[in-house]
Amino acid sequence: MVKNIRYSIEVDSKFHIENFLGNNNNTNDSFFWTEDHDHGGRQFFFTSSLISDMNSATEIIYTASQIIAIFQGIYTLLDRNRNGSNYFTIRNVYDIDSKRYLEKVQSTEIYKIDVDFSVIVASDENKPTNPIYILFEEICKDPFLTNLFFLLSNKVDYKMLYIIYDDIRFYLRTINDKTFLNPYKALLNDFTHTANNYEVLGFYARHGRTGHQPPSAPINLENSKNLIFDIIGNLLISKFNITLPDYWGMIYMDFSSVDLVQLKDILKKV
């Protein structure tokens, strides 16, 4: 598996993705796994080669939080059903060499990515097959992508979406692409006018009162999210040759056409 792994980090997740991430976790850098608990049930763990040489619990948590933020960003983009949900919560750090838990450290809020992901080297020997780990390795190859998925790890609101929009425009300027966003021009105009306008969003607007007229057709948060996330998906395909996976370990059922009375009777018999 991973070379020189020293720490296992206990992680909580409320979204039943442990088995998906714990299986087929062959990789050369960062991964999750599950173990049976002594008192029943299963525990969820994470580790990374990027923390193996560290000794400070504070440094380990700080670095691991940034790495896990990338996975959080992946799930935020793929799973559009929950805004601002924490898919991963760090609990404890266990030193495998000394067989002891490190002192608990209060998790600090991460404002930006400053971990050097370039030290992660893809290995043919440990080439990932799980689509989440494949996507993670692709993200780690480019600083723009690591920052993008860090931004995605934050609560979905107008401010978060606008920062992502700004970052995408900045990236497009660096590659002198002036046309990529043209198909979205009308919707982006509605989005920016909505996000900036205090009369529409109040405290949640990007600006205070400016005297500008509110947009004639404000775009709600759900549609704003889908707009920016669709742009991200197309950007990944066209600029990085990255296709997002169709399945990521979470299953949803559409109950709109289900006879709920009949379903209730069936469940009683199970």
Give a label for each model feature.
Residues D12, I17-E18, I90, L102, ...:
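Intrinsically disordered, low-complexity regions
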